């Protein structure tokens, strides 16, 4: 098969180690995919809330909602299930669970909180109606909700995606771009989307106190 892919009159030397690595990756993916489906079927996907501090007062002013799987007494991070979730088309299922569960929990306080959404969510075209339903169900003020999108979504400029994000903004929901600066940064697109928050990529932040270039980039942003 490898020789055919290389073209006519070509050959490929079989390397058992090469295929054992591929096989190991395949088995790991299958295991992760099975774990994810088990978590979905058994209501094991839960929200974790990471506090966001005000740099001046050091007080928590809002929370970021993070997806986790709680299984067999262990907490599993997205690193172990995000790839199979994307390849299996299950990211919107996870997003809906995060929205529902975080809204239910946050209904008991007045903090603002952010939830991550993906390009897959926008491709399904369900967010506007679903979030409106959950806002009403849990009596959450739209101004408390922040939706985080990756920079790639906003810079891709798909008209339908931008239309959906604008509709969410019209509900009173805030928008944030996550990991800004990790891809091609389109400032014009930020203006088009009327973004409320920019979460600058960590590579610019981690050395901001010692690296003049990082400082200047962040200051410019």
Report the location of each language-model feature.
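Catalytic-core segments of nucleotide cyclases and related cyclic-nucleotide turnover enzymes
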Residues: 1-8, 79, 180
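C-di-GMP signaling machinery
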Residues: 5-46, 56, 85-89, 121-124, ...
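Catalytic core of bacterial c-di-GMP phosphodiesterases, primarily the EAL and HD-GYP domains
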Residues: 11, 55, 59-64, 88-163
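A short, well-structured catalytic beta-strand-centered motif of the EAL phosphodiesterase domain
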Residues: 46-83, 196-198
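Signature for phosphate-centric chemistry
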Residues: 71, 81, 115, 179, ...
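Short acidic-capped amphipathic helix/loop micro-motif used as an active-site/signal-coupling element
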Residues: 71-75, 99-103, 179
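The catalytic core of metal-dependent phosphodiesterases that act on cyclic dinucleotides
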Residues: 134-208
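Alpha-helix-loop-beta-strand connector modules within alpha/beta enzyme cores
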Residues: 219-221
